[in-house]
Amino acid sequence: MSVFGGEGQTQGQFQQSLNKVFLFYGGGFAAFVILLAVLEQMGMPKEYIGYAFLAATVLLYGGIGVMSRTNDAAEYYVAGRRVPAIYNGMATGSDWMSAASFIGMAGTLYLTGYGGLAFILGWTGGYCLVALFLAPYLRKFGQFTIPDFLGARYGGNTARLIGVFAAILVSFVYVVAQIFGVGLITARLTGLSFEVGVYVGLAGILVCSFLGGMRAVTWTQVAQYLILIVAYMIPVVWLSVKHTSNPVPQVAYGYLLEKVTAKEEQLLKDPKELEVRGIFKARADAAAEKLKDVPAALAADREAATKKLEELKAANAPEAEIKAATAAVAALPKDEAAAKAAYTAARTTNTARAAPPLRHAEPFPGKDDAARDISRKNFLALVFCLMIGTAALPHILMRFYTVPSVREARESVAWSLFFIFLLYFTAPALAVLVKFDIYTLLVGTPMDQLPGWIARWNVVDPTLMSVSDINKDGILQLAEIRLGGDIV
């Protein structure tokens, strides 16, 4: 299709036609979102809204893939080297805003506070390295892939084979995380099982990339970026307005950070919180004690669980209690190796949950100067590693083969940084807004009055969100919340 291929057009005409297409697309997307919002207000079930979003996006990406089909090698592998810098920057931003950024960035900042800024600094710093040292030279050599570049630059097949191996290894590890994110989002929005969500995502990827290669992927990613940034910004703006009446979360969250800091000091001294953390500490100590003699501990656990089950049956206890006791017996480790692994995991988990929460705004936390110095060094080392890793990602570097010139390669990196900045500048605000919500609206709530979304997330994946009344007081404490970063 000429609108995505630019056949018979000058570069200027091609960009003008793209501007019209994506302006029309943006208007259509806005109208679609407004329509679904109206239908929701009219009583349309949320599951149907999730299905509508999923179907619309899969059809959209598949349609772009079909319209971008090509048999030309240059079009298939490097989109004809005609992608304007701004659109390549948008596609690169979409390519980069993967599960780690879109799903996990705010969660990482929520869980680690100041320490999470290492990811933002490292990832954005990596693009500076790309702009200065990599993108222009990759485009100058004019190959199709990174292994092609290595083969042309260093000669022979040895460098090429090393590049192939590294690209496959890195891409495989990277794709696993993305597929997990696809399954997670699909399961949450539509109610489909996680496994079905993974296959739906894989089918969409196949349709949008198989026929058109890099050309199809490029224009699909441009369309994706608009959806991603809108989907990310809307809830953050809504939370900002809700808590501060300010629609600019990047400005407003400083005010809430002060409140979060004050609430943290209160929770660190709260007697109920200390009680719950003490229970976790006792559980960790018990697990550590079991690890000293695993066979004896396993035998004692089996005897206690079996005895409890027999007592419940003898007393004609409620069926639910008998089922729970039966499940507890069945869940016991089958052998000493499994028992050792279970006790080790229990010790690790309970030790972590017994620790006081990190202060969100505290840089380089540690119990003494030596620990804080180690934390500082780890922060800087992480920034450095992330910079180098970002600059070497194969799927990012390949994007700079698609621009018309070396100059536009540099410009597209600048545009990439801008489009990524929009999300990364918002992620710290989202982390603080969510933490303020958790501290003020969830902590202290009676267990029988908790919002329904907690149970729904527990069904999707208990490691993402689960609560339990550890001290049996009927009130939810912060230490009783198990929250995974991906849920934020």
State where each predicted segment sits:
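Interfacial loop-to-helix junctions that mark the boundaries of transmembrane helices
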Residues: 41-53, 111-121, 186-196, 368-383
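Central hydrophobic cores of alpha-helical transmembrane segments in multi-pass inner-membrane proteins
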Residues: 32-33, 53-70, 95-103, 123-134, ...
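N-terminal alpha-helical transmembrane segments of multi-pass membrane transport
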Residues: 2-87, 207
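Helix-loop-helix module between adjacent transmembrane segments
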Residues: 12-29, 93-94, 114-212, 237, ...
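Membrane-interface helix-loop-helix modules in multi-pass membrane proteins
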Residues: 63-64, 75-143, 295-306, 310-326, ...
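Membrane-interface loop-to-helix entry segments
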Residues: 21-26, 45-71, 144-171, 177-187, ...
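Membrane-water interface regions at transmembrane-helix termini and the short interhelical loops
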Residues: 3-15, 35-44, 64, 108-112, ...
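Hydrophobic alpha-helical segments and their helix-loop junctions in multi-pass secondary transporters
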Residues: 38, 64-69, 172-175, 179, ...
